[in-house]
Amino acid sequence: MSLRLVAADAEKEFAQILHADNAAITQITSWIHNNLDRIQENETERDALALRIRDRLAPIRQQYLDFLKRHPQHARARVAYGSFLTHIDHRQGAIDQWKQALKTDPKNAAALNNLAIHLGTIALQTRQTRGIQEAFRALDKAIQLNPKEPLYRHNFATLLCSFRQPAARYYKIKPQQITQKAIGEYDAAIKLSPKKFEYAADRAEAFLDLTPFPHTEAIRAWQATLAIAETPDERDWAYLQTAIAHFKGEQWKHVTSTLKRMTGEHHQALAGQLRRATEAKLDEPKP
């Protein structure tokens, strides 16, 4: 058998594993969604679902292991397997797979992106930032390799916003400049993917970190976000965040009028807190 045929067979098998992986994750997501109330309230139900998920993923994991044993230099398979391992909360295993992929293919932007985001997630969960510099380096390189991938731009901006102080030390600029740098990266992501609500919402939220708070610019950003909202929940989130921006800008009456535009129940707890805080401000005696 020729090397070309061997490679073609490997790609076909890898595609089948990816399909099985995606199908399993889709099914598990459905299980969680359909049983959310029960697993939140009942520990036995939660444990039973966890066992069901483990059993569903076990054969997929074995397929990856068998494939990588026969094709250890297949970088894309290692990237995919690393992502798979995040679903079973095997953090170090995922990191090891992405680093192994980068040894084989140092220009694999997907591996660099995944590594950076995972290191950032671990830092947020553990409140330890020792891996953040590696995350910055990885996303810097991913963007260099593929500057037109909006996901990398968005992820980099989010990483900067989440770790302003470490980023300021790493890039040797002030935290305020880090936020401005992040907004620039969000701008790049939005230019590449202008209808992505998440990108626009995260950009608008970043203005909260600027001092003095640019109220007008923040409101304009949320208006642009609202214009591309496609679901009632997205619209409610944009209204809630617009109200928060008005609150920070001390535009109390605009807070109340904006909150009245919300129609769903999902964010009403936060809206209620903001409404009460605004009423307290309005009741304060004027100097």
For the regions a protein language model found, what residue spans apply to each?
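Structural signature of tandem alpha-helical TPR/SEL1-like repeats
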Residues: R54-Q62, H87-Q100, I122-K141, Q165-A188, ...
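Canonical positions in the second alpha-helix
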Residues: F67, Q100-A101, K141-A142, A188-A189, ...
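TPR alpha-solenoid repeat register
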Residues: A77, A111, Y152, Y199, ...
